[in-house]
Regions:
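Gly/Ser-rich oxyanion-binding loop with an adjacent helix/lid
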Residues: 1-56
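C-terminal nucleotide
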Residues: 49-210
Length: 210
């Protein structure tokens, strides 16, 4: 455990995403008053009190734009220092962590979808309201978001989207529903991708010590 904790600590300096990818399954990074195990210095694996619904999740990344990122993650973080909504965002994120932990325990996929999408859109809203401001989404991003929401309503399948700091869309859904969702992705969503390209990923077991 010390090896991975140290690896998470070191990788945090270069990448927050790497920091919270040292373990398989669900990882928690960031200090929170409700969770004694939490830390800003390294991530922690969460395995207790997590519904089996989240054991085998898929992530399909739709390549809407394959050009270089308009703004780096470090620059994006700096913009939050003077953003007029940053304090509200920090409080909201803190509350959402508590909500998420309850959702992970209950296995409520509908509430999971609502929270994930809210977080994604809030990130982009902050970038649009910063100074200088950035619109990271492309027109196709919004069309895909609308398609996913309509599909969820019509099919009653708990599939949702999240966004990175760019135009690409991550489609999240349980592995057990992959047959129906992958048909939707291939036949409809891939049409919005560069050369119909997308990356099909899944929850892994994390890196190995060598």
């Amino acid at each position: 455990d010390f090896f991975f904790k140290k690896a998470s600590f070191i990788s945090r300096i270069g990448s927050g995403s790497a920091c919270r990818s040292l373990y398989g399954g669900i990882n928690f990074w960031g200090s929170h008053s409700d969770f004694a195990f939490s830390s800003d210095l390294y991530s922690t694996q969460i395995s207790d009190n997590v519904s089996a619904e989240y054991n085998n999740f898929r992530d399909v990344i739709l390549i809407i734009d394959d050009s270089k990122k308009e703004v780096s993650s470090s620059v994006g973080h700096e913009l939050m220092n003077n953003n007029p909504f940053s304090d509200v965002r920090f409080k909201k994120a803190n509350n959402n962590i508590s909500k998420l932990m309850n959702i992970l325990k209950s296995g409520d996929l509908n509430e999971f979808c609502k929270l994930v999408e809210s977080e994604a859109l809030m990130l982009h809203a902050l970038m649009m309201s910063s100074n200088p401001s950035y619109i990271l989404m492309k027109p196709a991003t919004l069309l895909v978001i609308d398609k996913i929401r309509q599909f969820r309503i019509n099919s009653k399948i708990p599939v949702c989207f999240t966004l990175d700091a760019g135009a690409n869309v991550h489609v999240l859904f349980p592995e057990k529903l992959s047959e129906e969702v992958m048909v939707f992705i291939r036949e409809e969503l891939s049409l919005f991708c560069i050369n119909q390209n997308y990356i099909s990923d899944f929850v892994g077991s994390g890196p190995l010590q060598i």
